[in-house]
Amino acid sequence: MPIKSFASRLALSLAICGTAMGQKVNGADYNKPDGGPPAKFFQASSSIPVAAIQAAAAKASKVPSHATYPIGQGSTKSTIHSDWAGFSEGAAFSFIADMDVDCDGLNHGCKGNPDGQKETNWGALSAYEVPFIVIPQEFLDANKGTLKGNAVAAVICATSSNGKMFYGIFGDSNGDSPQVTGEASWLMARTCFPEEDLNGNKGHTAADVTYIVFTGDKAVLPSSALNKNYITNFDTLRSMGDSLVGALAKNLNLGGGGGNPPTTLTTTSIPEPTGGSGSCSWPGHCAGFKNKGATCSSNDDCSDDLACQNGKCASDGSAETCSWEGHCKGATCSSNDDCSDELACISGICSVDNGVETCEWEGHCEGASCSSHDDCDGNLACKNGKCSA
């Protein structure tokens, strides 16, 4: 993926986030088991090279002390890696595990969670409203100098769930005996796996979820966007997440992240959309925003059934449907596997290509990273680290 393309698209996303949305939320309004914040509030920008970051995390090998834990009682173990912990920007720990549901805090009595704790490590977070992840207490104790409470985290859901990336915070620790890893809040878990009906006693059992938790004081979500119970400004979370992941991607030579202009975040309410018909469920991404139409780079930047036309969200009755938000026509990609439905990755952009060949081995199609021919589908060959025809 060209660095210039990635950086320009990420900069546009950050600019939209900082000037168009500026949305404050009343956390209590979303403190419901089936009425939490929508996924779009904390999903990564479509410009982020999610598949490439997921592949890089799978290759991590550096093991710090106190880093290996079971993912459940008598189960296989997962190791937290520190390959990325030494970066000056975008420094992070990463690991791959399953996803159990944590309801500690405000919703400690959630379904399937009879023994929940009334508090989380740095407050009493709402598991219904806050997308947070959990780290073993022993690992936290060993890394208190760099691992901070309420630090921004990124979660890449399993490939079987379309491999989406969502942002959250490091909000709680696990002190069970034995301590386990692979745990996230009710909201994060049910957003990642909406078809599995997860609860406090039913988690996602496959160890195919990638967790990234950023380190240092600059990675901590500020009090202006968070109180002891709720996230109050998801725009701040998304902006910080995109910036940190962008820096990480640049460090990993995955195509950009640095050089973005500073983002000015506001905390005022967004004016109601005008100049268009019907309602708009995503303020700042509507057709009539300030009578001009919100700025966009792809259809995924626009609310409801709006389409991105000439850089503006607009009504389009002929807009094509897309089953994988963030990977629709116009989204940035590194291979065909990054694109929804029948779209193909052409020159780094998900596009319609009626001549595209099918690929039976997801994640190993043309354009995917490889180390040998065996890593590539069908008749594809590994050339210069990429599966090619």
UniProtKB/Swiss-Prot annotation:
Name of the top EC class for this enzyme: hydrolase
One annotated GO biological process: polysaccharide catabolic process
Source taxon at top rank: Eukaryota
Positions of R repeats: 280-313, 320-350, 357-387
Catalytically driven reaction(s): Endohydrolysis of beta-(1->4)-linkages between D-glucosamine residues in a partly acetylated chitosan
Chief subcellular location: secreted
Keywords linked to the UniProt accession: Carbohydrate metabolism, Glycosidase, Hydrolase, Polysaccharide degradation, Repeat, Secreted, Signal
Name of the protein this chain belongs to: Endo-chitosanase C
Species of provenance: Aspergillus oryzae (strain ATCC 42149 / RIB 40) (Yellow koji mold)
Lineage, broadest ranks: Eukaryota, Fungi, Dikarya, Ascomycota, Pezizomycotina
